[in-house]
Amino acid sequence: MDRAQKQEAIEALKGVFADSGAVVVTHYLGLTVAEMTDLRGKLREQGAQLKVVKNTLAQKALDGSVGEAGDALFKGPVAIAFAPDPVSAAKVATQYAKDNDKFTVVGGLMGQQVLDQKGVSALATLPSLDQLRGKIIGLLQAPATKVAGVLQAPAGQLARVMGAYAAKDAA
């Protein structure tokens, strides 16, 4: 790689670190091409990506913004999993690491915070952004539905009473 290509790669990584909800740093030593393709497919289904990065370029892209702890993540053969949703990449990477011994989660970055392996595992247990939005909408709609039911109940009872009087008068 010449200097211009390295600078372009650093700028691309800066964009990844800035635009991603969370970045999961992994070691992939020993994975076959088929296993990497399978992992990339699983990540893509969740809207995430996997990118093999050169450690020195990743450290320069971070530019000391997360300190020594962030630089320490980038040792050995490293791939980063990232997505706009902070949870999806962590979920897939953590699950894949459980299923495959050759793939390990080293840690992660979330904004300016460095996560260790346990932090990424904890992040993976959280519901995704879409699931949280669904729960919030459900919570907001539930009271309105109950209020509508309560308001309709007296009107229904009144209509039944009037119907009963009408039937009684007709008989």
From Swiss-Prot:
Keywords tagged on the record: Ribonucleoprotein, Ribosomal protein, RNA-binding, rRNA-binding
Entry's Gene Ontology BP terms: translation
Entry-linked Gene3D superfamilies: 3.30.70.1730, 6.10.250.290
Molecular function in Gene Ontology: large ribosomal subunit rRNA binding; structural constituent of ribosome
CDD domains according to UniProt: Ribosomal_L10
Gene Ontology cellular component list: large ribosomal subunit
Family matches, as Pfam families: Ribosomal_L10
Function as written in the Swiss-Prot or TrEMBL entry: Forms part of the ribosomal stalk, playing a central role in the interaction of the ribosome with GTP-bound translation factors.
HAMAP family: Ribosomal_uL10 (MF_00362)
Family: Belongs to the universal ribosomal protein uL10 family.
Cross-referenced NCBIfam families: PRK00099.1-1 (NF000955)
Complex and partners: Part of the ribosomal stalk of the 50S ribosomal subunit. The N-terminus interacts with L11 and the large rRNA to form the base of the stalk. The C-terminus forms an elongated spine to which L12 dimers bind in a sequential fashion forming a multimeric L10(L12)X complex.
Protein name in UniProt: Large ribosomal subunit protein uL10
Native source organism of the sequence: Phenylobacterium zucineum (strain HLK1)
